[in-house]
Amino acid sequence: MKRIVAIALSLCVLLSMLVMPAVAEESAAYRTLYSGEITSLNYLTTATTNEFALAANVIDTLVEYDKYGQVQPSLAESWEYDAENLTYTFKIREGAKWVKADGTVYADVTANDFVTAAKYLLDAQNASSTANIFYSVIAGAEAYYLGTSTPEEGQEPYPVMDFETVGVKAIDDYTLQYTLVEPCPYFLSMVTYVCFMPVNAEFLAEKGADFGVATSNENILYNGAFVLSTFEPQQKRVYTKNATNWDAENILIETIEQTYNKEAGTLAPEMYARGEIDSADISSTIAAEWLADETKADLIRPVRQSGFYTYFVAFNFDPNFDAEYEPENWKIAVNNVNFRKAFYYGLDRVKSKMVMEPDNPEAILFNTVTPPEFVSINGVDYTEMGALADITALETETFNEEKALEYMNVAVEELKAAGATFPVKMLMPYNPSSSAWAEECVVMEQQLEGLFGTDVIDIIVEAGPSSGFLKEVRRSGKYAFMKCNWGPDYADPNTYTDPFYDGTYNWPELATEYLDENGVS
């Protein structure tokens, strides 16, 4: 098992109480505004929230969740688990259809579609971002995946494996079987994830390299609640009810109309108030103004904005930003333990979260990366089990000015000796399409520079792109210090450890204290 490296500062924030308007009036069309465009329709390779949301609307999975969070049949009518042989056998619903973007039927959905998807996913040349989740639980999948990979220079190639060794089989057209590596009590929750979605083999072969390319809505098939009937990048997306869907009678919205505007976060509230769109996220500042306005007070309601996403501030140990931001100097600074500890105690989490929740910021702060109420056993919440109970019970306010300055004073002397220059430039980008992120960054900048001094640190707040932010900024390493998030891939707390393993997008394994004398992690 890979070594877990804890590098995040302030594993804390669940954005649970942003205000969002209710639907303005009854309509068969649901209209929204958006500023972050998708960059791929390939649900088997993507790993971005925007593209997950699209896939969830247009691709059905074996099971689904009801409004109570309970697993219910979807493309699988029923299933059985054989504990002795570690197999899950799913009975696929007969009559489910694949349709094209214009709604015409292309083929039946069969068990073979899930096998085809697995083979595509496990071909390392297709560069799926979620293949690791699949091969972590399915027998033979990791060995097959490694056998398709290209060895690094000086590395021996892995043995090429036959796909028959992978634990996914179509017993017949409507019987699908998975064999697990080991018992996995949360496996049913995993099959709702993108890496377990099906794909039609004939269509996949027909499209070839164009499968899932985000230039046309005709580059994927649809079997879910909606069809992406119109796709004009950076203009509009229209989802139309899939009349052939097996559960069509329970799809109550006829169309979803999404209009692109790079200023969506700014324009959406007033467009909603004028009745031009049906929902909009609004900041706490706007919420306060509207609640004081009798004509608007009834238009809004609080919502749990981000479900079970948690937010944390991360240091980047492999900076790849422009020279003007002094990445080499940042490397020296971030590799100093006392420098990092200074920020742990120096960041006033309550003050930064007042941008999102001015009345009760403590309500959206916690001490565990796994949020409360995510999973419980015998009525006991996971965050209240064992040693986690002590961590949960700690004060959420970690700010301690005296300790922060003590650590920073030590760090400054150590960094001078190591050749660092001051002030240390800290590039902190944000996604302009995310409500109040810019304001939060400004608060953090002012608070931290006010504490440590602008002669010690220079936090540079910079807007990243609205579309493709994850790829262009976080995955490219173009940040020093940034708010990041993580959402669950399946219903087990283990899913929240992923951002803190080696090989993630803040590269904790490159921290010098984790390297041996040969520079190997």
At which residue positions do the language-model features occur?
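Gly/Pro-rich hinge or "lid" segments in bacterial periplasmic/extracellular proteins
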Residues: 149-165, 169-174, 179-257
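Extracytoplasmic/peripheral linker and loop segments enriched in polar/acidic and small residues
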Residues: 152-154, 164, 341, 345, ...
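Append "and occasionally in soluble cytosolic enzymes with long acidic Gly/Pro-rich linkers
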Residues: 240-241, 333-451
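N-terminal lobe/hinge region of extracytoplasmic solute-binding protein
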Residues: 33-83, 221
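A bilobed periplasmic-binding-protein/Venus flytrap-type ligand-binding module shared by bacterial periplasmic
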Residues: 240-245, 262, 309-338, 355
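Aromatic- and charge-enriched surface segment that lines or borders ligand/interaction sites
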Residues: 77-140, 177, 268-274, 329-335, ...
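Sec-dependent signal peptide cleavage junction
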Residues: 17-27
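Ligand-site clamp/hinge motif
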Residues: 193, 211-217, 244-293
